[in-house]
């Protein structure tokens, strides 16, 4: 009886789930399918990210080991050289005191271990120091190669954007053109080499349609860092302003007419 009861309860739950899935609207079904697919899509890329992290750690430790060995050999060679030239010892001690302390202690313990096989393990101070130096150097190298400084151009006002917009459209009124705030845009070269390049006549015609009265529409082309490099412009229709007559002039004109 217990088995029959469990089987009937399981069947009822499955039928209830099926009924709920059939009664769901199509929009909710699509949203659920998108969520499940996105979760699966994210889970597919997680092993590769873990592998990349492990590779980065291995590269850092291997570089640290090589750098520590290089510094150990360098300091050991300089110590041997300074024994023959005492003047070099003073300059080295004033320039590189931490390195001499770390690596000379490391080599002294290594020499003691060679003479005394039962000696202690050398202190890992040089290893940690080399790891810190290599880590700082790698961060500085990445900042120089991939940071905002590497993306900056010769313009001193460059912001060093990563992926700036390729072009920018500006609608300038008559007051804006006369104000002198667009001098930087006026200095830009023309797209195509000259203002009357026939390859860009269609764009200039569209700019003329969008330009305000007595103003202009300027299409500014930008580089990846965001700095403007070229321009296209189209002027709007020219209309003269109607000057309003002052009340004094109207009064004088009325007096003349009455006479």
Swiss-Prot record:
GO terms for cellular component: membrane. Keywords: Membrane, Transmembrane, Transmembrane helix. The keyword Cell division does not apply. InterPro entries: At5g19025-like. It is a multi-pass membrane protein. It is found in: Membrane. Its main location: membrane. The chain crosses the membrane at residues 55-75, 85-105, 127-147. PANTHER family: OS05G0393200 PROTEIN, RIBOSOMAL PROTEIN L34E SUPERFAMILY PROTEIN. This is Uncharacterized protein At5g19025. It comes from Arabidopsis thaliana (Mouse-ear cress).
């Amino acid at each position: 009886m217990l088995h029959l009861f469990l089987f009937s309860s399981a069947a009822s739950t499955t039928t209830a789930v099926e009924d709920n899935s059939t009664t769901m609207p199509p929009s909710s079904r699509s949203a659920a399918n998108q969520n499940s697919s996105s979760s699966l899509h994210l889970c597919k890329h997680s092993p590769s990210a873990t592998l990349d992290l492990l590779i980065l750690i291995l590269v850092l430790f291997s570089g640290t080991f090589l750098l520590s060995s290089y510094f150990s050999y360098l300091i050991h060679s300089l110590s041997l050289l300074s024994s023959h030239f005492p003047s070099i010892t003073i300059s080295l001690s004033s320039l590189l005191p931490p390195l001499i302390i770390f690596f000379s202690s490391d080599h002294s313990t290594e020499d003691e271990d060679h003479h005394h096989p039962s000696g202690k393990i050398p202190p890992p101070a040089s290893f940690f120091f080399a790891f810190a130096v290599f880590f700082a150097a790698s961060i500085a190298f990445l900042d120089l190669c991939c940071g905002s400084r590497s993306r900056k151009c010769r313009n001193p006002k460059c912001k060093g954007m990563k992926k700036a917009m390729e072009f920018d459209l500006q609608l300038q009124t008559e007051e804006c053109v006369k104000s002198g705030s667009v001098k930087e845009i006026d200095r830009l070269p023309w797209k195509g080499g000259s203002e009357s390049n026939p390859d860009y006549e269609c764009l200039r015609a569209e700019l003329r349609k969008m330009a305000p009265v007595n103003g202009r529409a300027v299409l500014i082309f930008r580089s990846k860092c965001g700095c403007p490099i070229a321009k296209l412009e189209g002027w709007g229709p020219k209309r003269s302003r109607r000057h309003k007559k002052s009340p004094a002039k109207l009064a004088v004109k009325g007096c003349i007419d009455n006479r």
